Amino acid sequence: MATLFIADLHLQTEEPAIVAGFLRFLAVEARQADALYILGDLFEAWIGDDDPNPLHREMAVAIKSLVDSGVPCFFIHGNRDFLIGKRFARESGMTLLPQEKVLDLYGRNVLIMHGDTLCTDDAGYQAFRAKVHNPWVQRPFLTLPLFIRRRIAARMRAGSKAANSSKSLDIMDVNAQTVVAEMEKHRVQWLIHGHTHRPAVHELSANGQPAFRVVLGAWHHEGSMVKVTPDNVELIAFPL
């Protein structure tokens, strides 16, 4: 019995080794799981479910194969792929979840999320996030021709990279008070998230008790997953 969590794969055709590693993960490790949760940024960018990128179809087929084998797959949007919609969810068999979800995992209540909402010290990013998550912004964007959406997305990624290069690492990490507030709001002692690309298990105090924040790593030269069993919560790095 095990439930698996991954995040921040940033899949793109320019990184075939990561794509191949994910396909192998779906065919091997994930097939033995009770469920797979993808906590955002599965893709490097997403400009709409109507994008004919062959990689998207390939990933949908692979995830659907996992689901059809009896392993449910759940997805929380990240900051790169927040426009993944019902069409891709239907094609891949994934179940879309809200940005925060509490799970009962073998007797543990675990809060899961992408993690970008915890980085409250980065006021500029939070303002940008609020804007692009506004349905009144998303709907007009999704009606634009694909070539225009690609240009806008490329410009936004370049702008984000430039902005991040001038920010301190502390600003781009989670805010400790925000973490505790979220865990106490949901009355949990466990939190699993991604986004920061800083894999670690942090011990803290919440609800007057010891608590744990488990941060998934990004997939680069190796993969990263959290494996939850009735007896343990493990952060695991593995070769792609």
Swiss-Prot record:
Entry binding sites for Mn(2+) 1: D8, H10, D41, H197
InterPro entries tied to this protein: Calcineurin-like_PHP_ApaH, LpxH-like, Metallo-depent_PP-like, UDP-diacylglucosamine_Hdrlase
Pathway: Glycolipid biosynthesis; lipid IV(A) biosynthesis; lipid IV(A) from (3R)-3-hydroxytetradecanoyl-[acyl-carrier-protein] and UDP-N-acetyl-alpha-D-glucosamine: step 4/6
Gene Ontology CC terms: cytoplasm; extrinsic component of plasma membrane
EC number of this enzyme: 3.6.1.54
Cofactor binding annotation: Binds 2 Mn(2+) ions per subunit in a binuclear metal center.
Major localization class: membrane
Binding site for Mn(2+) 2: D41, N79, H114, H195
Reactions listed under catalytic activity: UDP-2-N,3-O-bis[(3R)-3-hydroxytetradecanoyl]-alpha-D-glucosamine + H2O = 2-N,3-O-bis[(3R)-3-hydroxytetradecanoyl]-alpha-D-glucosaminyl 1-phosphate + UMP + 2 H(+)
One Gene Ontology molecular-function label: manganese ion binding
Cellular localisation: Cell inner membrane
Superkingdom of source: Bacteria
Binding locations of substrate: N79, R80, D122, S160, N164, K167, H195
Leading EC class: hydrolase
One GO-annotated biological process of the protein: lipid A biosynthetic process
Family in the record: Belongs to the LpxH family.
Function: Hydrolyzes the pyrophosphate bond of UDP-2,3-diacylglucosamine to yield 2,3-diacylglucosamine 1-phosphate (lipid X) and UMP by catalyzing the attack of water at the alpha-P atom. Involved in the biosynthesis of lipid A, a phosphorylated glycolipid that anchors the lipopolysaccharide to the outer membrane of the cell.
Annotated protein name in UniProt: UDP-2,3-diacylglucosamine hydrolase
Annotated source species: Salmonella typhi
